[in-house]
């Protein structure tokens, strides 16, 4: 079951002026399931995105990248149950045909539509089911359908994921709302995740790509469930500009304030993925400090977070903490002085000076391991940089869920 995670109250997901969402059932994987989502954007909205680094990227990712270079995005279409990945030229054609059908509904050009898919890889996109369902999704468009969309984009997720924040900029109330899906094949850059965060703030087009990368770097690129990088990962930032604030044109105070709110929403969504990791029973925070740069801190944090031996030890509540030291050692950080390291499990000092801490108590460590939320802290003692990664344990259910995924 998810770790300290519940679906958001629909009333807590605030409408974003300039955004409407509609949901319908295409029956892609299961008859009657609401698995098709349309998102309509007001004219003048600005959109930026970051996508999977997997070289075997899905057809919709390729099409999204093409369409984003042309600007003026007016609609998004999202299907679950089929990834449209590993589908070659036919997959590209079906993604583009989907965009054309959506464009007809909105009376825009097909290049103004971004397609997204998530689900099983290597199976043809069932366009014969998707296209007939699009008018129903279009008829369902409403500003308040964030909660319904959060549920519609799920695959193996147990809990829908959404969050909202508000802030003041230039005397105007700015709203930020986001939804995401993902609970397996989660590892940056990025994870099997789709994330959509929208704001009504006005921000210059030249800053949008910087903003989406800044936000992804501290959120969706800091979470791992199983170390697998998906073919379909996409994080989209939308700014409708309808709040009426003076356009944010430089990376000053207003940019920083908006970035903080966007990051706050994105971090909540990213952490929800680890909390909802397939079969998860523990939520783990891996915090590495004292590095020469953030990259090496992140490198060590990920080595710990994705280690199957570390993750299974946490599932068993077994303080077999030598596995953490082993992961640090094989992380690949150059010239690392292991004798300068310190490792804590919660507040329990586990290792220092190259070995077990003098006052270490296995009973104290075992007590920490029984908690549902656990922090591992590592000090490298060679600089001021730091990085944090979120993950979960590996349980029997992780194997069961993935073994039975197609059956």
UniProtKB/Swiss-Prot annotation:
Pathway: Amino-acid biosynthesis; L-arginine biosynthesis; L-ornithine and N-acetyl-L-glutamate from L-glutamate and N(2)-acetyl-L-ornithine (cyclic): step 1/1; Amino-acid biosynthesis; L-arginine biosynthesis; N(2)-acetyl-L-ornithine from L-glutamate: step 1/4
Record-annotated site: Cleavage: 191-192
A GO CC term assigned to this protein in UniProt: cytoplasm
Residues at the active site: 192 (nucleophile)
GO biological process, one term: ornithine biosynthetic process
GO-annotated molecular function: glutamate N-acetyltransferase activity; L-glutamate N-acetyltransferase activity
UniProt keyword terms in alphabetical order: Acyltransferase, Amino-acid biosynthesis, Arginine biosynthesis, Autocatalytic cleavage, Cytoplasm, Multifunctional enzyme, Transferase
E.C. numbers: 2.3.1.35, 2.3.1.1
Subcellular location per the Swiss-Prot or TrEMBL entry: Cytoplasm
Positions of substrate binding: 155, 181, 192, 278, 402, 407
Catalytic activity: N(2)-acetyl-L-ornithine + L-glutamate = N-acetyl-L-glutamate + L-ornithine; L-glutamate + acetyl-CoA = N-acetyl-L-glutamate + CoA + H(+)
Signal sequence range: none
Protein's UniProt keywords contain Phosphoprotein: no
Site entry: Involved in the stabilization of negative charge on the oxyanion by the formation of the oxyanion hole: 118-119
Function: Catalyzes two activities which are involved in the cyclic version of arginine biosynthesis: the synthesis of N-acetylglutamate from glutamate and acetyl-CoA as the acetyl donor, and of ornithine by transacetylation between N(2)-acetylornithine and glutamate.
Subunit record text: Heterotetramer of two alpha and two beta chains.
Record-stated family: Belongs to the ArgJ family.
Protein name (database record): Arginine biosynthesis bifunctional protein ArgJ
